[in-house]
Amino acid sequence: MARRLIRPRRWDPPRLADSGATAELSVSRRLPTGGVGPEDVVFDHAGRVVAGLAGGRVVRIDPASGERAVLAETGGRPLGLHPRADGGVLVCDHDKGLLEVGVDGSVTRLVDVAFPSNVVEASDGTIWFTTSTTRWTLDEYLGDVFEHSCTGRLMRRAPDGTVTTVLDGLKFANGLVLAPDESHLLVAETAGYRIQRHWPSGRTEVFADNLPGFPDNMWLGSDGLVWVAIVAPRNALLDRLLPLPGFLRLLVWNLPQAVQPKAAPIASVMAFTLDGRLVHDLRTAGGSYGFVTSVAERDGLVVLGSLTESDVAVLGNSHA
């Protein structure tokens, strides 16, 4: 079956720089989810892990005992999550839009939107969320990376339900963090190898640029650090193709998948201070846990999620 036609946009990516010393990313144990693909993992206010799975289930796992409960069935594909103080969860569902899961397991659609990716909520009830692309689906995400469509958005849902686009033209908008004082947000641009800082007043600046890979979901840990999942390292062939005439990417896109650029099997997470200083750069090559799409930290415990794995991984490194 022929692949969808891409509309390549030229972009000159920054030359990959050496990020300096890295530490080994070591998985000490796994927490079974009872399903596949815990794409985003977060801690609720009681310290339990919450994850969304392929097939629509949102599950809660006690990281000490492994005890598991199903919070809700969305009927779609849950991606980014945000735990609410009352025990409910905001869910970015690829198929259903931005959802609210109540403590009773009820599911309510708040915004009918395609490919919502991550979400945070302010103390006044304002909800901020990203949409990754208006051109492609989750199953076709590589098309957006190849095309560089720049159709990602940061959006805002006001307490009265009004929805507005705050930023557009983003390079596959993804992870989202709200600063502790709620003065600004951090937005990951997966296909732009960077994280932007945005003030609701309208100012936007680069928080972290020229990352060694594709940043995915993010989490503000109890340690005050911004934890970032790097879903895959940058690909040298793709970086060479992006600034060249688009027909070259068209040619490569239509080649057999076996000869196209592929993600290297490297698991990676990074952690930054709120002023953008890199504190942790954890990597492992060819490890037992791959395609890391999310990371969360609470009281020194660091967990990972993945679009393809069946379990939530618990790191053995001490980050307290």
What kind of feature is each model-predicted range?
Residues M1-A320:
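Sequence-structural signature of mature extracellular/luminal beta-sheet repeat domains
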